[in-house]
């Protein structure tokens, strides 16, 4: 529902011959294809790929998902939107800033160069957006505490108030960070009780939980719909 039309036929994933880092999900006769860059420095990516595919089906939007490991991957993909997945933020920084990658400097420049570009950062991805540590301003206007929820054993699931979606959302927290504060320029995107668990600055959305581990595609639909709107 939510004012969106269901797809007219099932979507089929097409992996181009010889490609190991790109998925093309065909739409129902659409001619415009959204290119989604999925940062692959460390951490799981399959949940986001599956969520993007389901979201594309629900929105009837044709997408290509490009995995990004190096700065050259970002340039080649020329994405309309970015997903920064969870993982271990320290490892992601080391890998993404290494001379063999340099993805993070290129990515942060890409994000800062156009405030309309949609970005979804989850868990460790939210840490990188709030605390890029590259000498520039934060990419979302919030202070964040890494691993504030503690150990893997302290992970949990709970219903959230997804204010950006206008409804509840099933949240999955795994060694989650915590927003300590946010500026007036940032919009609260999700709440867990009295605690802010999602912050939006422009079209950059940082979530301390893992929406890709839920069957609800609301946040991935937001990314695709925002990218489609920005490109229209």
Predicted regions mapped to residue ranges:
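Cysteine-nucleophile active-site neighborhood
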Residues: 89-161
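N-terminal beta1-alpha1 cap of cysteine-dependent amidohydrolase-like domains
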Residues: 4-98, 217-221, 225-232
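Pocket-forming structural segment of enzyme catalytic cores
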Residues: 134-195
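Solvent-exposed alpha-helices and their adjacent loops that cap or buttress functional pockets
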Residues: 74-76, 112-114, 120, 163-166, ...
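C-terminal and late-domain segments of enzyme folds
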Residues: 168, 178-232
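Structural motif
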Residues: 81-85, 120, 173, 206-208
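A structural micro-motif
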Residues: 34, 61-63, 117, 135, ...
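Glycine-rich nucleotide phosphate-binding loop and flanking beta-alpha elements
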Residues: 45, 89-91, 126-128, 180, ...
């Amino acid at each position: 529902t939510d004012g969106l039309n269901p797809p007219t036929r099932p979507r089929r994933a097409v992996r181009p011959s010889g490609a190991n880092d790109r998925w093309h999900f065909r739409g129902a006769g659409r001619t415009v294809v959204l290119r989604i860059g999925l940062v692959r420095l460390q951490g799981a990516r399959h949940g986001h790929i599956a969520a993007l595919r389901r979201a594309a089906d629900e929105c009837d939007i044709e997408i290509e998902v490009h995995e990004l490991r190096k700065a050259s991957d970002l340039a080649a993909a020329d994405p309309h939107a970015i997903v920064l997945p969870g993982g271990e933020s320290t490892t992601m920084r080391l890998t993404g800033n290494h001379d063999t990658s340099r993805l993070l400097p290129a990515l942060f420049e890409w994000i800062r160069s156009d405030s309309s570009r949609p970005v979804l950062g989850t868990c460790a991805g939210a840490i990188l957006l709030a605390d890029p540590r590259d000498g520039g301003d934060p990419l979302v206007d919030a202070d964040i505490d890494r691993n504030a929820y503690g150990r893997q054993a302290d992970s949990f699931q709970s219903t959230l108030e997804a204010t950006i979606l206008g409804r509840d959302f099933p949240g999955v927290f795994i060694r989650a960070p915590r927003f300590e504060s946010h500026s007036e320029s940032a919009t609260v995107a999700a709440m867990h009780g009295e605690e802010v668990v999602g912050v939006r600055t422009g079209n950059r959305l940082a979530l301390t939980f893992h929406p890709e581990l839920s069957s609800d595609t609301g946040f991935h639909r937001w990314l695709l719909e925002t990218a489609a709107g920005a490109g229209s």
